């Protein structure tokens, strides 16, 4: 299972905030590149995710990078504001203990892992990700850029055309240009995909599909 691709698709489908400290009912702000890995509070590194999607995002980050990402996943699993299954709770707790104590597991950790694995299907390369030394890993600048670019690449290479009811048109390329023009790029792309019919009075189409 390609967790990197799943994570990229998840953040790609989310909406970026239009201003610092913006809130949205029923959503939480998520750092595409976690702050613990050097991610910034820049708007292009932030997306709104539902509570469930936010939990899923941290689960994916934990599976991709291991180490301290399991600490964040455990915190979310242990929150009173989230409903998680007993197997999710056991798995998150076991991985946090494993991360704290290294490869040497206590009997308690082994028991938790056996409970979790009886209900959670792990990928074939899961053990390899841990053994490859991902624990406590710090991403290089190039790797950070790779993650950021992969999560935004689809948006940044698309040119869209907006049509107003009075016949005016506007041509914009990439999420930044769309935001600077006063539109929400996620809503614009939903219009282009046929998920949404109109955004701020405009209908939208991908230029390369006209």
UniProtKB/Swiss-Prot annotation:
Pfam families: HNH. GO terms for molecular function: DNA binding; endonuclease activity; zinc ion binding. SUPFAM superfamilies: DNA-binding domain of intron-encoded endonucleases. Keywords: Endonuclease, Hydrolase, Nuclease. The keyword Nuclease applies. Residues 25-54 form the HNH domain. To phage T4 mobB and mobD. This is Probable mobile endonuclease C.
């Amino acid at each position: 299972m390609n967790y990197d691709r799943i994570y990229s698709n998840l953040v790609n489908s989310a909406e970026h905030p239009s201003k610092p400290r913006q809130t949205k009912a029923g959503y939480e702000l998520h750092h595409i590149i976690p702050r613990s890995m050097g991610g910034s509070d820049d708007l292009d590194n932030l997306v709104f995710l539902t509570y469930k999607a936010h939990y899923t995002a941290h689960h994916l980050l934990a599976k991709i990078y291991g180490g301290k990402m399991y600490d964040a996943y455990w915190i979310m699993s242990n929150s009173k504001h989230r409903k998680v299954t007993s197997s999710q709770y056991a798995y998150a707790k076991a991985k946090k203990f494993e991360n704290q104590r290294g490869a040497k597991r206590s009997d308690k950790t082994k028991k938790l892992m056996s409970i979790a694995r009886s209900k959670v299907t792990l990928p074939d390369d899961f053990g390899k990700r841990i053994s490859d030394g991902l624990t406590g890993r710090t991403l290089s600048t190039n790797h950070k850029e790779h993650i950021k670019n992969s999560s935004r690449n689809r948006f940044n290479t698309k040119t869209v055309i907006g049509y107003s009811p009075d016949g005016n048109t506007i041509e914009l390329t990439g999420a930044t240009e769309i935001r600077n023009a006063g539109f929400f790029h996620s809503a614009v792309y939903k219009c282009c995909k046929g998920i949404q019919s109109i955004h701020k009075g405009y209908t939208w189409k991908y230029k390369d599909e006209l």
